[in-house]
């Protein structure tokens, strides 16, 4: 997922590149009134000026074919299809210039669904690309090293590489309830940090100054409690807990994911010297499995 706010943070942290879905590029160009030529779908872009990270937008169809379809195909037949698509793309591009087709798999591990953990497919993939006269494989860093051109975005429409939006993580009443629990716990946590003098000022790449926890400040209780509290809050904020709420991603482990999420909220509060909110002790009902 990316947004203009996230890209500012990435620039501050000096990330060289990030990646997301081509749908985010299409929405961003529409938002900014830009109409890129088809060739510009196969190059990185930048938003935010010099020093901002390059953004690569994956080819959704081909990436999902590798991630979700080709495990059911003979590796040779699958690569025949993939090479055919890549050759078609290449014929539609100018002769001169550096272009690439980003193949970025979904977050799940695709290879466990392939026979032999994907070894036969990967050998076919790298062998066929290496032997092809007009195609070669590359990392994103290598592509940038070769000096390929970057498109400049005037706006970035916030979105993920799943449908180019955030509906997987928000919108359902149970997902909303999870966000409410997180927001309340985060507000309590930040108030405790402010009261304890545990916030420092951090300047972002665009010049804005924002508060951030200072891990060198000793929290309440044992030395290191504040660092552990920060880690617990980060665990609650940083994973796909909301993916599993609602009815769009069924799982038999809904109760376990819910317990883990609320456990991180309670741990963060306790380690920061707070009494965990009582509502974090009650399960969030889960449509996709046991509740």
Question: PLM features: residue spans?
Answer:
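Acidic-and-aromatic substrate-binding clefts and catalytic sites of carbohydrate-active enzymes
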Residues: 1-4, 25-34, 111-112, 145-146
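Contiguous, well-ordered alpha-helical segments that form the cores/surfaces of helical PPI scaffolds
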Residues: 4-5, 231
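Acidic, His- and aromatic-enriched active-site or binding-groove loops in soluble protein domains
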Residues: 7-49
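Active-site and substrate-binding clefts of carbohydrate-active enzymes
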Residues: 35-65, 70-291
């Amino acid at each position: 997922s990316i947004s203009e706010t996230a890209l500012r943070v990435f620039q501050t942290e000096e990330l060289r590149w990030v990646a997301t879905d081509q749908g985010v590029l299409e929405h961003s160009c529409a938002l900014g009134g830009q109409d890129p030529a088809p060739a510009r779908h196969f190059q990185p872009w930048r938003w935010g000026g010099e020093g901002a990270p390059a953004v690569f937008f994956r080819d959704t169809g081909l990436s999902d074919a590798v991630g979700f379809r080709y495990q059911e195909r003979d590796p040779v037949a699958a690569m025949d299809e993939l090479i055919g698509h890549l050759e078609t793309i290449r014929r539609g591009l100018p002769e001169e210039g550096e272009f690439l087709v980003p193949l970025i798999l979904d977050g799940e591990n695709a290879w466990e669904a392939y026979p032999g953990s994907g070894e036969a497919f990967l050998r076919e993939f790298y062998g066929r690309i290496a032997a092809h006269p007009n195609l070669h494989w590359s990392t994103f860093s290598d592509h940038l090293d070769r000096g390929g051109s970057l498109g400049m975005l005037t706006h970035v429409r916030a979105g993920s590489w799943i449908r180019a939006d955030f509906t997987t993580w928000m919108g359902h009443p149970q997902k909303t309830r999870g966000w409410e629990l997180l927001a309340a716990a985060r507000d309590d946590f930040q108030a405790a940090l402010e009261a304890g003098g545990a916030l420092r000022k951090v300047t972002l790449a665009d010049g804005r100054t924002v508060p951030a926890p200072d891990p060198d400040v000793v929290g309440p209780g044992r030395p290191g409690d504040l660092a552990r509290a920060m880690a617990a809050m980060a665990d609650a904020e940083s994973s796909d807990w909301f993916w599993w709420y609602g009815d769009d991603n069924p799982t038999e482990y809904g109760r376990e994911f819910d317990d883990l999420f609320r456990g991180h909220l309670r741990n963060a509060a306790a380690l920061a010297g707070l009494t965990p909110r009582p509502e974090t002790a009650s399960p969030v009902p889960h449509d996709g499995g046991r509740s």
